[in-house]
Curated annotation (Swiss-Prot):
Pfam families: Fe-ADH_2 (PF13685). It catalyses: sn-glycerol 1-phosphate + NAD(+) = dihydroxyacetone phosphate + NADH + H(+); sn-glycerol 1-phosphate + NADP(+) = dihydroxyacetone phosphate + NADPH + H(+). This is Glycerol-1-phosphate dehydrogenase [NAD(P)+]. Catalyzes the NAD(P)H-dependent reduction of dihydroxyacetonephosphate (DHAP or glycerone phosphate) to glycerol 1-phosphate (G1P). The G1P thus generated is used as the glycerophosphate backbone of phospholipids in the cellular membranes of Archaea. It comes from the Archaea. Zn(2+) binds at D171, H251, H267. GO terms for molecular function: glycerol-1-phosphate dehydrogenase (NAD+) activity; glycerol-1-phosphate dehydrogenase (NADP+) activity; metal ion binding. PANTHER family: GLYCEROL DEHYDROGENASE, GLYCEROL DEHYDROGENASE 1. InterPro entries: G1P_dehydrogenase_arc (IPR023002), G1PDH (IPR032837), Glycerol_DH (IPR016205). CDD domains: Gro1PDH. Homodimer. The lineage of its organism: Archaea, Thermoproteota, Thermoprotei, Desulfurococcales, Desulfurococcaceae. Its EC number is 1.1.1.261. Keywords: Cytoplasm, Lipid biosynthesis, Lipid metabolism, Metal-binding, NAD, NADP, Oxidoreductase, Phospholipid biosynthesis, Phospholipid metabolism, Zinc.
């Protein structure tokens, strides 16, 4: 058991059609009445929705300073900080995972609260207290700020590229292997394990499995289910105080691919494929079910569908344990041999 466990949770979650119009009201309800709002966004998102959002905020007396980011990196975040025109009262992350991850990091550096306004369901960073940024020393993610609120507009999300929205499905299903890794680390290494946070993360994954038919067409009902599952996953991380309930060996595999692949796929696509293989290593029959659901929902289940060479899959499996050596998973401390990695990828159908 930990000597001390601190939980920081968001104060408000608003999900529905047209909820972007409620953003000024939500910000005011959280105690920010007027002043400057820093909006961190992406160029495509801002070109489509920026004028409307700026108008909504200015109408309610807020001064808006917006900045666009093109990649989730410490360098990009530092550019935002260096280019500030004033001292914002609150930061808004308005976009996909890149913009929101940078916004959370910037908010942490400024000592300000951050409101998450996701425009796609690409991964569970929309509600988590962690940011995955390039240029970090050590782990690929850093504890930043838990969003004080999440405002998810299904109308906006439905207009995101289908591939981006589908990617979040893979990130939610990854909880099946992540929680198993966490439990394994608890049993073998004495690491803290929070059963409540683990149960919440698993519930998100089970929810997506149960309602997968609604997700196939990415209907508004399906998108709402996916958004709520991603938010629940973020809450699980808040409760755990770490990314453990949401990120395990499947994420290490994905991060390894990011390092070595010539053209990595989307994060959620890669962890989905990783989940298939890691569940097999855990001896869980669930790997076949996850593979079937990913196939049914038009998500990659093979190296070819990821657009990654077979050799890169094998290499990623052999180096994944080195990405975060302090995070014990089914890959063990020594990782997989090349022979074991190739056998795993072939057995699960990831490579031919």
């Amino acid at each position: 058991m930990r000597d001390r466990h601190e939980i920081e949770l968001m104060k408000r979650v608003v999900v529905g059609r047209g909820t972007r119009r409620e953003l000024p009201k939500v910000i005011k309800a959280l105690g920010f009445d007027g002043g400057e709002v820093l909006v961190v966004t992406g160029p495509h998102v801002w070109s489509e929705w920026g004028d409307e959002l700026q108008g909504l905020l200015e109408k309610e007396g807020f001064k808006v300073d917006f900045v666009t980011v093109v990649e989730p990196s410490v360098e990009e975040a530092n550019k935002v900080l260096e280019g500030l025109n004033g001292e914002p009262n609150v930061v808004v992350g308005f976009g996909g995972g890149k913009a929101i991850d940078v916004a959370k990091y910037v908010a942490m550096k400024l000592g300000r609260d951050v409101v998450s306004v996701p425009t796609a369901t690409s991964h569970d960073g929309i509600a988590s207290p962690f940011s995955s940024l390039k240029g970090l020393k050590g782990p690929t993610s850093v504890k930043t700020k838990t969003p004080i609120a999440v405002v998810a507009d299904i109308e906006v999300i439905a207009r995101a590229p289908e591939r981006l929205n589908r990617a979040g499905i893979g990130d939610v299903l990854a909880k099946f292997s992540a929680v198993r890794d966490w439990r394994l680390a608890h049993v073998l290494k004495g690491e803290y394990y929070g059963s409540y946070a683990a149960s919440l993360a698993l519930m998100s994954a089970k929810h997506v499995l149960k309602y997968s038919p609604l997700l196939k067409a990415l209907s508004e009902d399906g998108l709402r289910i996916l958004v709520e599952a991603l938010i629940s996953s973020g809450v699980a991380m808040c409760i755990a105080g770490s990314s453990r309930p949401a990120s395990g060996s499947e994420h290490l595999f994905s991060h390894a691919l990011d390092v070595i692949a010539n053209r990595p796929a989307l994060h959620g696509e890669q962890v989905g494929v990783g989940t298939i293989m890691m569940l097999y290593l855990h001896g869980s029959k669930l790997w076949r079910k996850v593979r079937k659901v990913l196939r049914d929902l038009n998500l990659p289940t093979t190296a070819e569908e990821l657009g990654v060479e077979d050799e890169k899959i094998i290499e990623a499996l052999t180096i994944a344990h080195k990405i975060r050596p302090e995070r014990y998973t089914i890959l063990g401390s020594d990782g997989l041999t090349r022979e074991a990695a190739e056998r795993l990828a072939r057995t699960t159908g990831v490579i031919k």
